[in-house]
């Protein structure tokens, strides 16, 4: 897994919530993420390593309180792990490049995939395709 900063660099470069979510499999409170209501066109990247993860065209409002997407930019962008924590059976999603925790994927999304990638804003950055502005979640 390339381009992952050292733990010290991560602690110094991320907010407390960003570090908790990406490095300790945390979850930000619902409806609080900076990128939840972002409607601009562009690409969502991993906050830790800047790998592209999701295109804005695949983002939709699932009503769950976290940014939701119906597919990643590529099969390699996401790593999937079984998560049996908190008495639930879920599929955890991590960055395929640096292994940062992103969120979970559920089989209740819209077509064409039927999947809902439920992602913490704190694990993402967004690059606006119009002006190149980057927004960190």
From Swiss-Prot:
The keyword Metal-binding applies. The keyword Magnesium does not apply. Zn(2+) binds at residues 46, 49, 95, 98. Residues 7-129 form the MsrB domain. Its cofactor is Zn(2+). It holds the Pfam family SelR. Binds 1 zinc ion per subunit. The zinc ion is important for the structural integrity of the protein. It catalyses: L-methionyl-[protein] + [thioredoxin]-disulfide + H2O = L-methionyl-(R)-S-oxide-[protein] + [thioredoxin]-dithiol. One of its GO terms (biological process) is response to oxidative stress. PANTHER family: METHIONINE SULFOXIDE REDUCTASE, METHIONINE-R-SULFOXIDE REDUCTASE B1. This is Peptide methionine sulfoxide reductase MsrB. It comes from Klebsiella pneumoniae subsp. pneumoniae (strain ATCC 700721 / MGH 78578).
């Amino acid at each position: 897994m390339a381009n992952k900063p050292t733990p010290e660099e991560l602690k110094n470069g991320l907010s407390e919530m960003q570090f908790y979510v990406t490095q300790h499999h945390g979850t930000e409170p619902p409806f609080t993420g900076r990128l939840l209501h972002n409607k601009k066109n562009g690409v969502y990247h991993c906050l830790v390593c800047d790998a592209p993860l999701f295109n804005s065209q695949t983002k939709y409002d699932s009503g769950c309180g976290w940014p939701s997407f119906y597919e990643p930019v590529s099969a390699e962008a996401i790593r999937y792990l079984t998560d049996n924590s908190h008495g639930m059976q879920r599929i955890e999603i991590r960055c395929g490049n640096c292994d940062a925790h992103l969120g979970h994927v559920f089989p209740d999304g819209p077509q064409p995939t039927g999947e809902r990638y439920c992602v913490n804003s704190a694990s993402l950055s967004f690059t606006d395709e119009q002006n190149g502005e980057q927004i960190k979640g």
